């Protein structure tokens, strides 16, 4: 039996690591969840994701409720109060229980002398809640985004930025990809129905299913057998443009965690696929996905800027470049992105993308297809990136995705329930 732990203090420390130390929640959370019971795992995840999603609101409220901020070794208490406020605002946890557990969290973080302070701040919020929220809802903080990102979205999407922000602040739907080598989508939906769950097919992407209610993967029919994979609909859209064929040599660059590698092999089981990623740790997930789906591909660790180091002079029929990016299209799935990214990251990422494009283009055969994809919504990483590449690359031609003046296809977050995603299909003349 697992030791009873204070979930509020665990959530506070996790959020502090994201905001103060720049760590990714996807790295921090799984080890913490191993320390708690199954029933507490979901609540711990809800507290971490929820606080990060609404961080600017919770920060704003604390600044109104406290005369001075908590600093130094007491900084964790700031995040513990955030966890308390989040419960009072956004969960069905009875207020008395939320207060008691949050106050008790001070003991777990070795700050028992501050129990009275935490209790006082949360009770003050309860008394002033209506007037505080009215003031908050009249401020720019209500958009729950850092100001630098808000400015970029307003500039890029003067008509749509509010709907993008709204979508980013929602909980994401759960999308699945049915493995067509095992089942048709309709036959798998029938199995889902038999299991007491409901799903809906995507209108454009032939393997995509949206669950009516998110479910643990072990509850999905045939998950362990490789019949189905968790993957957002927009990410599945890459195959529409790549159109892999049996017998071709295909490069999946920046491949981890392997969702698109395995999708290529579902569409073209006889393709020769090379999956490359710079992050050796994340490559283990590519191996895991290939094993679960019973597929084979060549997997290598390598830097996309130096392809000769990992493929020599080899050329490919098709290349999928899922470029490193700001991930501003998947904020609803990873709310920590809002607080991990900085404005200065964008030109640095655009430069990296440009270098990878230039380096990998010679490794595409004449007549071959390169699909450039990102999970970003920022033009510097997307349409402007491809426009500049077309201008400096004489044998590159845009195909089916946009115009030379406005190249690529941009999916915005929440459109058809998918994530924000960009695709550009390029043909080598």
Curated annotation (Swiss-Prot):
Indicate the residues that form the catalytic site: 375
PROSITE patterns membership: NOL1_NOP2_SUN, SAM_MT_RSMB_NOP
Kindly state which reaction or reactions the protein catalyses: cytidine(967) in 16S rRNA + S-adenosyl-L-methionine = 5-methylcytidine(967) in 16S rRNA + S-adenosyl-L-homocysteine + H(+)
Q: Which Gene3D superfamilies match?
A: Helix hairpin bin, NusB-like, Sun protein, domain 3, Vaccinia Virus protein VP39
Q: Where in the cell is it found?
A: Cytoplasm
Claim: Iron-sulfur is one of the keywords in the record: no
Q: Does the keyword Cytoplasm belong to this entry?
A: yes
Give GO BP annotations, semicolon-separated. Answer: regulation of DNA-templated transcription; rRNA base methylation
Q: What is its EC number?
A: 2.1.1.176
Q: CDD domains given for it?
A: AdoMet_MTases (cd02440), Methyltransferase_Sun (cd00620)
Q: Which UniProt keywords apply?
A: Cytoplasm, Methyltransferase, RNA-binding, rRNA processing, S-adenosyl-L-methionine, Transferase
Under Pfam families, the record lists:
Methyltr_RsmB-F, NusB, RsmF-B_ferredox
Positions with a binding annotation for S-adenosyl-L-methionine: 254-260, 277, 303, 322
A Gene Ontology cellular component where this protein is annotated is:
cytosol
For molecular function, the Gene Ontology terms on record are: RNA binding; rRNA (cytosine-C5-)-methyltransferase activity
Q: What is its main location?
A: cytoplasm
- What is the documented function of this protein? Specifically methylates the cytosine at position 967 (m5C967) of 16S rRNA.
What the record says about family reads: Belongs to the class I-like SAM-binding methyltransferase superfamily. RsmB/NOP family.
Q: What protein does this entry describe?
A: Ribosomal RNA small subunit methyltransferase B
Its gene? rsmB
